[in-house]
Amino acid sequence: MSLFAIIYMLFTYLLGSISSDVVICRFTERNDARVTNSNVLQKGEYRLVLVVFLCDVLKGMLPVWVGYYLGLTYFELGMVALAACLGHIFPIFFKFSGGKGVATAFGAIAPIAWGVAGSMLGTWLLIFLFSGYVALSTVVTALILPFYVWWFKPEFTFPVALVCCLLVYRHHENIQRLWRGQEDKIWSKFKK
């Protein structure tokens, strides 16, 4: 791995550490310091959800695309994707307490191949529509995703598998609630 790639990965980690929800909260003068997508959905502020989601996706997507045009190897690009997700999940600017990394991971993995992005999104939507559980959709998609990557772009399988392990780890509390039958379906949040 080149020195440039390592420096670029550190830069990407720092970029990933910028919390979109906190920045948007400050720009919109909201009191809630953590405008996460699920929190905003519960409050009915759908435009903010879209803005936070797009910013989180771009945190993962832009560094990978730029790295591709800078001539990074496939392995280095995979590590850049991992760095973006690590920054979002364990941000240095917020005492290493961040989000779950789903949108950032999607953004980081999507540039690999449109087939991977479509398969990932299709799997997530299918499971979500049948179950109503966001966490279940995310975890199952994260478990299947390395196989999609292996099928379309096998050279990215290892770094993407690491990102998927992070996603499953960040959802461990949701997995426990699902197991106990205590996880809320997304529809129940709208009924409140």
UniProtKB/Swiss-Prot annotation:
One Pfam family matching this protein: G3P_acyltransf
Residues spanning the membrane: 4-24, 48-68, 74-94, 101-121, 125-145
Q: Which GO terms describe its biological process?
A: phospholipid biosynthetic process
Its keywords, alphabetically, are: Cell inner membrane, Cell membrane, Lipid biosynthesis, Lipid metabolism, Membrane, Phospholipid biosynthesis, Phospholipid metabolism, Transferase, Transmembrane, Transmembrane helix
Catalytic activity, reaction form: an acyl phosphate + sn-glycerol 3-phosphate = a 1-acyl-sn-glycero-3-phosphate + phosphate
The molecular function GO annotations come to: acyl-phosphate glycerol-3-phosphate acyltransferase activity
How does the entry describe its membrane topology? Multi-pass membrane protein
Q: Does the keyword Transcription apply?
A: no
**This enzyme's EC code(s):** 2.3.1.275
Q: Please provide, in alphabetical order, the Gene Ontology terms of the cellular component aspect for this entry.
A: plasma membrane
Localization recorded for this chain is: Cell inner membrane
Pathway field of the UniProt record reads: Lipid metabolism; phospholipid metabolism
Q: SMART domains, from UniProt?
A: G3P_acyltransf
Q: Report which superkingdom the organism of origin falls in.
A: Bacteria
Q: What class of enzyme is it?
A: transferase
Work out whether the entry's keyword set contains Kinase. no
PANTHER family membership: GLYCEROL-3-PHOSPHATE ACYLTRANSFERASE-RELATED, INNER MEMBRANE PROTEIN YGIH
**So what family is this one in?**
Belongs to the PlsY family.
HAMAP family found in the cross-reference section: PlsY
Q: How does it assemble?
A: Probably interacts with PlsX.
Name the job this protein performs.
Catalyzes the transfer of an acyl group from acyl-phosphate (acyl-PO(4)) to glycerol-3-phosphate (G3P) to form lysophosphatidic acid (LPA). This enzyme utilizes acyl-phosphate as fatty acyl donor, but not acyl-CoA or acyl-ACP.
The name on file for this protein is Glycerol-3-phosphate acyltransferase
| Organism encoding this protein | Histophilus somni (strain 129Pt) (Haemophilus somnus)
The primary gene name is: plsY
